Amino acid sequence: MKIIAGVDEVGRGSLVGPVYAAAVILKKSINTKLLKDSKSISSSKRKVLFSHIKKNSIWAIGKASLTEIDQLNILNASLLAMKRAIKKLKQKPSHVLIDGNKLPNIKNYKLKSIIKGDQKIPSISAASIIAKVTRDKVISDLGKKFKGYNWQKNFGYGTSQHLKAIKILGITKHHRKTFSPINKLK
């Protein structure tokens, strides 16, 4: 029997915090018609689906830290987060479908990259939702400690409000030091 895991990452373009990835093996009982790319679903619906997916799947989260992002670059850090998520699954999948066009370096797994997989493959869509809700909560909680950057709404992405806050308040220890415009402000 084929056991398929879907994998996606979130946070690559953010100026703040770790990059997260999720790996999800869906149970047959889940209604896959509800699953779409996390970016195309409202925040409230994502949270409902997050709970539903967690109850109806085997799932795991992987992340790469700020230090790893700055040392490896964002692409390699994203692939590392994916590898960690796959390895943390409680059941080894026979096939792993990954959103995008790059694959992590991981032995003894059958991997396949799928461009726009988060829009085509339910298990990748589910991984997208798990990763996004998880990361959004972490960054939102950080925003409560680092007021003024509006991370509860922009989740660390380079919105005009966030960039203005950086100019006024400066960078924090949670900003990615190798990312523009952060690297110009050090």
Regions found by a protein language model. Name each.
Residues 1-186:
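RNase H-like, Mg2+-dependent phosphodiesterase core
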